[in-house]
Amino acid sequence: MCIRDSPDTQFTIIDGVVDAPNVQNVIFKEHEGSFLVGIMAAMASNSGTVGFVGGMDIPLISRFECGYKQGVAHADSSMSVLAQMTGSTPAAWGNPTKGGEITRSQVENGADVVYAAAGGTGMGVYQTAADMGVLAIGVDSNQNYIQPGTMLTSMYKKVGLAAYESFAAAVDGSWSGGFKVNGVAEDGVGAAMDEYNADLVSADMLAAVNTARAAIIAGDIVVHDYMSDNSCPL
């Protein structure tokens, strides 16, 4: 079904954009969620160096990277961040071997926490981190269960909630086209806490995340969005 051929049908696109009046585009402030897990990475690190493994080298993934770097610096401005994208083609999303190789290199260069925003490539990041005795951070959904005990947290996006809210709005008549942006203030992104990472998250770490979350909501912390100007302040 073509969206433009069905003007009386309401469509919701999650994590994508279609410019049409009968489409609601739901997108997320990944930079804000990445800021929160960056704080956790900095606080969990003993080496003073953390890592980031991106998937395809596109502005969206640079948004994750930039938010993460800002969170790390917010917690400890002396920290170093090693960052590398997996590739420049869609194959970068499904190369766990390459993800593992990048992770190994970062760990050998001092990183003891590695955040992956790389799709299926992240599975290689998580496995290598576990094998080398360092921590990893998952992405998009709660992936803490994948390597229990070595997954510090995951930067989740509440896609299910976004879908529910869109359907509920359609039912009650409040649905509208355009953009719906879910960030920290909308409880659309955050850092996952559960039984799988409970032993890794200190009270101080949790307090720091909650304080930063409140500051973002209040507007006291503004996390720069790489996609707003294709630049990162760090």
Residue spans of the language-model regions?
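A residue-level marker of the well-folded mature domains of exported/periplasmic proteins
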Residues: 4-234
